[in-house]
Amino acid sequence: MHTLIKSVLEEILEAEVIIEHPKDREHGHYATPIAFNLAKIFKKSPLVIAEELALKISTHAKTQGFFDSVVACKGYINFTLSLDFLERFTQKALELKEKFGSKFKSENSQKIFLEFVSANPTGPLHIGHARGAVFGDSLAKIARFLGHEVLCEYYVNDMGSQIRLLGLSVWLAYREHVLKEGVTYPEVFYKGEYIIEIAKKAHNDLEPSLFKENEETIIEVLSSYAKDLMLLEIKDNLDSLGIHFDSYASEKEIFKHKDAVFKNLEKANALYEKDSKIWLKSSLYQDESDRVLVKEDKNYTYLAGDIVYHNEKFKQNYTKYINIWGADHHGYIARVKASLKFLGYDSNKLEVLLAQMVGLLKDNEPYKMSKRAGNFILIKDVVDDIGKDALRFIFLSKRLDTHLEFDVNTLKKQDSSNPIYYIHYANSRIHTMLEKSPFSKEEILQTPLKNLNAEEKYLLFSALSLPKIIEASFEEYGLQKMCEYAKTLASEFHRFYNAGKILDTPKTKELLKICLMVSLSLTNAFKLLGIEIKTKISAKD
């Protein structure tokens, strides 16, 4: 609808047209400030130009049937859509059902490589991981809905010092809790009940002869064993959020290609040796300083593994590569992009989205940390507490790059203070009316819209605006727009519901048709957010 209006206006006016929503709904459904832009070109007052353009648009053959009114107001041109125009789009939308708002794959479709979560398999997923996980999953859903091809990948950091530290931590826990030895723990190690659980499970699963080997062999085996267990648990945690990856990429396997990558970096004159270390000349490409890739002890840095991984990704020639990282990784962006330039790739294809911190409260007090994980709040604990759908909604309700803090008890309330409940309640009200109505769904769908007032038309317009919201959410990586849209549409519906009788009136079928459109838009919006909308819910407010 928005796209059609924009394209027709641009054809008539032979200029790019920006379409906005008026702040006051009494001014119509759409508005454009184009007169202000043209005023400089034609050296006329925006008010005069707006009047001229409003007349031109309203009388043009291509807009007949589109608008009830086209009015110039303080330099803006305001448009009120006709009921016939709205009904045409309503009928089409209701026929499309779950495909309403979607696009077919076309020449403009993108091939997107989306990497997210990628938490080290050294412990259970905590609530900080959940934000990027939920965002990435919904972004992929929206991208596919819009006709793009998406590969979702989890990069498994299954080698290096962190994995060895995991094995060491399990070995020390084994000695303390299984062998009952006195143990001195290092300053840095993995702690929490999950480490003890792994140690005890290793005692039952692994051959007793292993624990008679030298310590390095034991740590190596326990590192691999614990890593595999944690990865299984991570997959279970993600499954509880409704998240499934197309691919799990092993750093250990990918890093086998390091020699070829380093050879290409050498050819590009990207490396040098200093202080017995190998450095990347990343400062040549907007990085703050050069970065170490190989340390004095000949071990590789985390960045070296990241470079090899990105080389593997870029060899696959996707249109766009999106990484979702924690905000604490912001310093890595410049150095990774520098390596891509040295390797001959277009670094602009890489977009890194940063997920800010999450603060969880319960009754206005900090949420209790998990004993099992030490000083973290586990995803599993929060999902068990409030459910996957509430967690997904609240995590998507603010921009990814802004701090998020919320009280989980708000999401347990059955009143308008709980946004997800209020949206479910709107859909529940609609389905209850449809059940009570003597009319079949087919009768309602075939009913022409002829007698709607301004408020009813605006509710219908809001429900039909979903496609534009979906596109904007994807293009701006602003998935909070979907949450805001669903909340606003639900609120408008509740106002409509409370304003007067819907059943047993002369225009009941018309009003129920609006309700069907609202339900469809709420259902499709929630589906893209990874939430199943409810059709039955009790009200206590």
Curated annotation (Swiss-Prot):
GO cellular component: cytoplasm
SMART domains: Arg_tRNA_synt_N, DALR_1
Residue ranges annotated as motif 'HIGH' region: 119-129
Pfam families: Arg_tRNA_synt_N, DALR_1, tRNA-synt_1d
Localization, UniProt: Cytoplasm
Signal peptide: none
Single GO MF descriptor: arginine-tRNA ligase activity
Catalytic activity field: tRNA(Arg) + L-arginine + ATP = L-arginyl-tRNA(Arg) + AMP + diphosphate
Entries under NCBIfam families matching the protein: argS
Protein's UniProt name: Arginine--tRNA ligase
Taxonomic lineage of the native organism: Bacteria, Pseudomonadati, Campylobacterota, Epsilonproteobacteria, Campylobacterales
Gene, per the UniProt record: argS
